[in-house]
Amino acid sequence: MEILVAAILVISINIIAGKTNYGLEGDEVFSYISSTSMGGFKGICYLDDQKWYDADYFRNAVTATGQERFNVKMVIENQAMDTHPPLYYFFLNLVCSVFEGQYSRWFGIGLNIFFMLFVGLGLYLLLQYFVQNKHISLISATIFCCSYLAVNMTLFIRMYVLAMAITLFQSWYHLIVYNKMISVNEYPFKKYGRDYVSLFLLTISGGLTHYYFLVYQCLISAEFVLMLFIRKRYKDMCRYAAAMMASALIYICLYPVALQHLFFKYRGRDAVHKFLKESGIFNEVFAMLSTFNSQLFKGTLFVIMLTLFCLTVFLIIKKKIGLFQLGKLCFLVLPSVIYFYVISKASPFITIRYISPVSALLYAAVIVWAKILIDTAGRNNIKKTASIFLCICLFFSSFYFFKKPVKAAYFAERMDVINELSKKSSYCVYIGDDMAYWRMWEDYINYSVFRGLYFIDGQKKSPITDECFLEQENLVIYIDTNLEPEDIFAYLNTYLPSYQYEIKYTTNYTYIVLGEKMSG
């Protein structure tokens, strides 16, 4: 019953947040394009200069119809063109395929809410393993799934919630297998094959979700091997290593283009270059930590850490706790902190999505640390009071109270502006910057409010001869922000001399302009 109530709360919080935060980023629109379009972004997003595209063109780009439905091969081919693995997009294709020819951002949000329930389950199992208290584990897991960070990731229609869930289950299952291993003399494949297969499948699933998962997998595997080595479980160490190597080989066989993505495409090369460049050892890490602290702990993380540290030192001095008792934190902390550092340095932007896979593990480490200290109390009533206080602190420091919007206001404002402008003109124009057409993805879900879109290459500035374009009384014009608006207005005035132009809204990538024909 408690688990059902927790699940309903998580679902409700995310739905309410989804209703008050709308509009999609370009990457989210790209998730739909990758999941539902034959030919992927190369077939859909590279537009021809001086050509009309009707509303159905953009509507079809984000909906699954005909052969696009339940098409695993299409999704894999689309992602091979891009720089990400295909598993999440396969799931999104399944959802969109059920609703043939329809688009809704709730398809992606609903899928992420489903995965967030697994995040809650994985975090609950992990916490229960350490704290051995169902109420603390359930309440803490629920609060995390209702935090600003978790809601942010749920509403962001990409693969990060799925990556978070797989990371949690992989961590928890490694602990389960390790405990089983040290409780018996040997852990052969023949007798315990199910456990090796489970680790094998989780590893492949994580690698097919996001390449950053492979960084965490290497770290947790190294830690696992070290733990077995210390216990002189050499045969089990070799069996585990064999299972992981087998998973790597099968992974490459299933998705061979991963090697190209990791070592030869721009994302892989740029990640290595950014990690190695001398920009200050901790600059990016501190920036990422600030974002993490703000989104998960509302800026209270350092106060929490200082409090726990001081209590720990006090209890060590009083000989009520030993370093050995704190050792269990190493399994959670070491791979997570190293991942946090590496990805903060290597990721292209300072944004929470890249470190979200280990965010729940770091959150769990704080709770486990606090519970270790609570357990030093002698009397049960003191432990109970301290546990209640811990849950209250987590609630106020992490629970999302809707005071801060998850998505930037301009996503919603832009949609409102476009809807108003569509009343002025039935057609729109996009003037792009050479081949950087990805900058127009953000509005693929909005272009369909117009009857058609006329695409112009803003670098070529070819003569405009299209009669339909030249006959328009008003035009809604998108101009790539890489281009100078005044230069574009001068170019348009050559063919539309009686027009005046007003920039109605500016986004990161486009100026949204209303062009009106002057009377007389």
Question: Where does each model-flagged region fall?
Answer:
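Transmembrane signal-anchor helices characteristic of membrane glycosylation enzymes that use polyprenol
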Residues: 2-62, 246-259
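Interfacial juxtamembrane loops and adjacent helix segments
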Residues: 36-84, 92, 96-101
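Specific aromatic-rich, kink-prone transmembrane helix
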Residues: 94, 122, 142-146, 150, ...
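Transmembrane-helix motifs of polytopic, lipid-linked glycan transferases
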Residues: 107-131, 169
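Membrane-interface alpha helices of multi-pass inner-membrane proteins
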Residues: 140, 188-211, 222, 246
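Hydrophobic/aromatic-rich transmembrane helices and adjacent perimembrane loops
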Residues: 163, 215, 346-378
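Membrane-embedded, lumen/periplasm-facing catalytic core of multi-pass transferases
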Residues: 393-460
